[in-house]
Amino acid sequence: MTTPKPTIAKISPECQTHFQDIKFRNKYQGILLKVNEESNMVVDKTLVAEGEFSELAQSLPTDQCRIIIYRYKSGEGSKLFFIYWGPDSAPQQDKLIYGNAKVTLAITLKGIDHKISASNLKEISEQVFIDRITPKTA
């Protein structure tokens, strides 16, 4: 028996609408995207606009991949983050599917400031976000 090849997920119009809602209207703090049974990228969860950073980590499944678009707000403004969540305990097939979806989304969604790939919560701690947006001094 052969393992089916991962397919490139189609991005649902809902994903693009929610992305615009984050980017231009600050309607959400973030969205978690998943690939459904029909290989469509769909919105799994939304994070409220004025939510706490801890809500992001609490929303992540421990054994499933997700793509997250997250607006991180700081004293210097806000930045959009594209996060690939592939925990070590997720099935390898899912990691391949989401890896392909990550490429498709990165091309489609314009205006992302930073990208993060994470397999554990330490890799998406608030300090990681702060380090990404803080200008480096020489």
Swiss-Prot record:
Top-rank taxon, per record: Eukaryota
GO cellular component terms given for this protein: actin cytoskeleton; cytoplasm
SMART domains recorded: ADF
Keyword terms, alphabetized: Actin-binding, Cytoplasm, Cytoskeleton
Sequence ranges assigned to domain ADF-H in this UniProt record: 7-134
Location, primary (coarse class): cytoplasm
Subcellular location: Cytoplasm, Cytoskeleton
Ranges that cross the membrane: none
GO molecular function: actin filament binding
Pfam families in alphabetical order: Cofilin_ADF
One Gene Ontology term from the biological process aspect of the record: actin filament depolymerization
Function, as annotated: Controls actin polymerization and depolymerization.
Similarity annotation: Belongs to the actin-binding proteins ADF family.
Name of the protein described by the UniProt record: Cofilin-3
Protein source organism: Dictyostelium discoideum
